[in-house]
């Protein structure tokens, strides 16, 4: 089936677009390709683009919830094939300002850990083998 359009950006509302773009650039790499006071675009090494848009009065989502202030989306990052890779990535994202939301005690049952970025959006570091 032919597509109607091509996805250009995944856009994330936040209180400080420049700070959140810097956080994700440190996590995933890439370069800033557009910068305005209320809008920043980060182009990742694989070509995916993340946009960060100023949202006045921004309230971070609460994870996990299913009501009006619930998570709307989240990003999954491949940290590597081993738990040691995930541990190393976890150390780095925590140093960058992320906050741990859930670390599964049974690594056989789960292959990811859940964090919040500095603006409160949930994201996961995944062990992909």
Ranges and model annotations:
Residues 108-110:
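Short, small/polar residue-rich loop motifs at catalytic or cofactor-binding pockets
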């Amino acid at each position: 089936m032919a597509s109607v359009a091509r996805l250009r950006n995944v856009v994330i509302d936040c209180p400080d677009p420049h700070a959140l773009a810097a956080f994700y650039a440190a996590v995933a790499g890439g370069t800033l390709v557009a910068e305005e006071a209320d809008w920043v675009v980060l182009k990742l090494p694989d070509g995916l683009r993340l946009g960060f848009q100023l949202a006045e009065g921004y309230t971070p989502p609460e994870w996990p919830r299913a009501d009006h202030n619930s998570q709307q989306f989240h990003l999954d990052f491949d940290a590597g094939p081993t738990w040691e890779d995930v541990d190393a990535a976890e150390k780095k994202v925590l140093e960058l300002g992320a906050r741990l939301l859930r670390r599964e005690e049974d690594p056989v049952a789960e292959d990811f850990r859940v964090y919040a970025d500095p603006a409160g959006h949930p994201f996961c570091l995944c062990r992909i083998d």
